[in-house]
Curated annotation (Swiss-Prot):
Family listed: Belongs to the RNA polymerase alpha chain family.
Name of the molecule in the record: DNA-directed RNA polymerase subunit alpha
Leading EC class: transferase
Any one of the GO CC terms: DNA-directed RNA polymerase complex
GO MF terms, alphabetically ordered: DNA binding; DNA-directed RNA polymerase activity; protein dimerization activity
SMART domains in the cross-refs: RPOLD
Domain writeup: The N-terminal domain is essential for RNAP assembly and basal transcription, whereas the C-terminal domain is involved in interaction with transcriptional regulators and with upstream promoter elements.
Function: DNA-dependent RNA polymerase catalyzes the transcription of DNA into RNA using the four ribonucleoside triphosphates as substrates.
Top-level taxonomy: Bacteria, Pseudomonadati, Pseudomonadota, Betaproteobacteria, Nitrosomonadales
Entry-linked NCBIfam families: PRK05182.1-2, PRK05182.2-5, rpoA
Membrane-traversing stretches: none
Length: 336
């Protein structure tokens, strides 16, 4: 079956409404293809265009995100929200960089105050991060990374957690440089044919990517994904027997095996934390909200876990297992 009879669309016009906002006109499409391809492009633009975002911050004098900073109008939560609004670009194929923010003079702290390396470009230097009052100052280390989509801090890998130190705050990262996308389909004409489609994509970015470039990237993603179907052959799928999830035996041990102080152990049990697998999924901030569990107890827990190559904030896909009691009764899994 030949597809040569289909018309080939092209970008015929780009209306640059502002540096961040453009309307891209493409035609001609066969009747109905404007909606089909317009919806596909919109979904890829919103979900799959790569970008950069802050993923971790360490602020001098701050141990967790619920702190306040003397001499700063904003609390740490507001400061983090403002940091997420900084638009960056990483050059020379870099995927990560650590930036420094230092300011001790009274006034407004903007993205332009961040000391960027030659591989990092700050797109919106006038973006307000904080306000310093008399006698205040701010010192922070900001880790920025390249990625795509949305990356919740709770989904970070074990390596990210173990490499973090006290005072490091992991951020929920939204990498997408696309702020808004919509599309409209109008009638188009080629010679005597009047039943064709014209596709108009209205796209707004954060300034780190050109709107037309973003559309070309989205189209390339779709072409690569659909190319598989062009050579599609019928092949039987191998049948696999479902496997029981493998649970690390140490996660099935009771927290009593950690030999914590009585105060720390009692605090954990009040929070229904009975197994090591329960404990490692809690974050520092969650434990600090536990009644009677302070920074000293938290440090004790972290040190004991570190001695077993574990850390707080780890994500377990199959916890708790549906047959937890059976796991514990198996040979080698006994709690004591």
């Amino acid at each position: 079956m030949s597809s040569n009879s289909f018309l080939t669309p092209r970008i015929v016009e780009v209306h640059n409404i502002s540096p961040l906002h453009a309307k891209v006109v493409m035609e001609p499409f066969e009747h109905g293809f404007g909606y089909t391809l317009g919806n596909a492009l919109r979904r890829v633009l919103l979900s799959s265009i790569p970008g950069c975002a802050p993923t971790k911050v360490s602020i001098s004098g701050v141990v967790h995100e619920y702190s306040t900073i003397d001499g700063l109008q904003e609390d740490v939560v507001d400061l983090i929200l403002n940091l997420k609004g900084v638009v960056l670009k990483l050059h020379n194929n870099k995927t990560q960089s650590v930036l420094t923010l230092k300011k001790s003079s009274e006034g407004i702290v903007t993205a332009g105050d961040i000391e960027a390396t030659h591989d990092v470009e700050i797109v919106n230097p006038d973006h307000v991060i904080a306000h310093i009052t008399s006698g205040g100052k701010i010192e922070a280390q900001i880790t920025v990374e390249k990625g795509r989509g949305y990356w919740p801090s709770a989904n970070r890998s074990k390596e990210d957690k173990s490499s973090s130190s006290i005072g490091d705050i992991l951020l929920d990262a939204s990498f997408s440089p696309i702020r808004r996308v919509s599309y409209a389909v109008e009638s188009a004409r080629v010679e005597q044919r009047t039943d064709l489609d014209k596709l108009i994509i209205d796209i707004e970015t954060n300034g780190s990517v050109d709107p037309e470039e973003a559309i070309r990237y989205a189209a390339k993603v779709l072409v690569e994904q659909f190319s598989f179907f062009a050579d599609l052959e019928s092949t039987p799928l191998p049948t696999e027997q479902p496997k029981a999830p493998v649970i690390d035996p140490i996660l099935l041990r009771p927290v009593d095996d950690l030999e914590l102080t009585v105060r720390s152990a009692n605090c954990l049990k009040v929070e229904n934390i009975f197994y090591i697998g329960d404990l490692i999924q809690r974050t520092e901030a969650e434990l600090l909200r536990t009644p009677n569990l302070g920074r000293k107890s938290l440090n004790e827990i972290k040190e004991v876990l570190a001695s077993r190559d574990l850390s707080l904030g780890m994500k377990l896909e199959n916890w708790p297992p549906a047959n937890l009691e059976n796991y514990i009764k198996e040979p080698g899994h006994a709690s004591s």
